[in-house]
Design a protein with these regions (language model features):
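Extended polysaccharide-engagement surfaces of secreted carbohydrate-active enzymes
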Residues: 174-232
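Aromatic-lined, polymer-binding surfaces characteristic
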Residues: 1-173
Length: 232
């Protein structure tokens, strides 16, 4: 019941009428929530490897419809080309939210009797889109491990939204190789953090910094000591 209420509040917030639509499911606000919907679904759907059957049939059907509408717009097959491993769509954390959520939504849909045989707007199957993004993120881990980790380095904004997406893929992917690689990337990120800080205060370079009010005491006291992992 609460999940249905949550969906209706999303629709109302986006000024929709009636049911979920492509425009609402792919909206900026819903994108920020999609990792939670993915986690709920993968943990509790009827065939979950974690806690199967805790989602009732109506809630599961509702979430699958939301996933379908989301990927119908947000999964761009060409973007999953391995040439784009270091491309950034908007910003790093938005990039990760945008496409990793598509991967896990596609994983759900390819295993759903109702959606597994459907074609996305480009004419490709759900499984083809899933395979493309799954391959992309496995290579993402290798490339980031070889050439650098996060682009938004010690940013006050990016990592707190990027890392939960990596954790979702580490926890929820059905691909054992992807889970293992995401786990290793998380270890590398925290190892990098550990060697760059002393007693919780980090030094070194940063990226994506907004010095909108350098005289603000809150900004001054946060400098070097407020890594976003504490607020994840």
């Amino acid at each position: 019941r609460h999940l249905q209420e949550a969906e209706q509040r999303i629709i109302a917030h986006e000024k929709g009428e009636g049911g979920m639509t492509v425009e609402i499911a792919s909206s900026e606000h819903v994108k920020w929530q999609m990792r939670t919907w993915n986690r709920l679904y993968q943990l509790f759907h009827d065939k979950s490897r974690f806690y199967p059957g805790r989602l009732d049939a109506k809630a599961q059907e509702m979430i699958e419809e939301m996933f379908w509408l989301y990927v119908s717009k947000m999964s761009r097959f060409e973007r999953a080309n391995l040439d784009h491993i270091w491309s950034i769509h908007g910003s790093e954390n938005h990039e990760m939210m945008h496409y990793s959520n598509a991967l896990l939504a596609l994983q759900a849909l390819k295993n759903s009797p109702k959606y597994k045989n459907r074609k996305l707007p480009d004419g490709r199957s759900v499984e083809a889109h899933y395979d493309a993004w799954n391959t992309y993120y496995k290579e993402y881990c290798v490339s980031r491990a070889k050439h650098g980790l996060l682009v938004e380095v010690f940013s006050a904004y990016g990592p707190s939204y990027t890392l939960p997406e990596i954790m979702n893929m580490r926890d929820l992917s059905e691909d054992e190789v992807l889970r293992e690689r995401m786990d290793k990337i998380l270890h590398l990120i925290w190892a990098d953090w550990s060697v760059g800080q002393v007693a919780g205060v980090r030094g070194g370079g940063r990226t994506r910094i907004y010095q909108d009010d350098p005289n603000n005491i809150r900004r001054l006291t946060e400098w070097g000591s407020r890594d976003r992992w504490r607020n994840m």
